[in-house]
Regions:
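C-terminal substrate-binding subdomain of Rossmann-fold SDR/epimerase-dehydratase oxidoreductases
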Residues: 1-114
């Protein structure tokens, strides 16, 4: 994009956890084959990062040279959202696609679309 900047709500300090959809699909298949209990199982990556870190990572992945403008007049939202994934890990499942790699894959796919 030739845009000079991208506006982002909040000041970038809110922390979020992100999981690639391929990892989610694999986790659901894993649970269908390996879990029969009725207790809830969280599926996630167990790591979080700030919205600022996410924006900077996306900026690098897509080669955006403009500014990231964080607008603190908009809400940050919940300070932190991260799941306890110890149960699914103890069953033997772990995510395999790191966030940066997943972002790169999705961007490459998107760029290849007409």
């Amino acid at each position: 994009s030739n845009a000079e900047s991208v506006n982002i709500w909040g000041n970038g300090t809110a922390r979020r956890e992100f999981l690639h959809t391929d990892d989610l699909a694999e986790a659901l298949l894993f649970l269908m084959e390996n879990y029969a209990d009725s207790a809830i199982v969280n599926v996630g990556c167990g790591e979080d990062q700030t919205i600022r870190e996410l924006a900077e990572t996306i900026q690098k992945v897509v080669g955006f040279s403009g500014r990231l403008d964080f607008d603190s007049s908009y809400p940050n939202g919940t300070p932190q959202k991260i799941l306890d994934i110890s149960k699914i890990n103890s069953l033997g499942w772990k995510p395999r696609i790191p966030l940066k790699e997943g972002l790169h894959q999705v961007y490459q796919w998107y760029a290849a679309q007409d």
